[in-house]
Amino acid sequence: MRDPIILEQVKASLAELVRLSPGRAIEVRIPPFAAVQCGEGPTHTRGTPANVIEMDADTWLALVHGEKKWADALGEGLINASGARADLSSLLPLQNRISP
């Protein structure tokens, strides 16, 4: 069962990510909570996107709040990222950017 508090935090932070980096070049998946497309570049419309980032909610929220760095999480195997544009390090953390 999905925790409603974590669900809200994941959805709000992903919405802010999309606001900061509009587009459809990267698919960010935080199962089982949400998935979004963001980032400038070639638009994805069908099938598996060329650029995919997937991680659990705990890792995502740690990145959002600056409790973990992208490179560290990637090196620890907490992030599954494929594709040339599958890197959100320049956008994280989001803690000071999330709208109230």
What does each model-identified segment do?
Residues M1-P100:
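Feature captures hydrophobic
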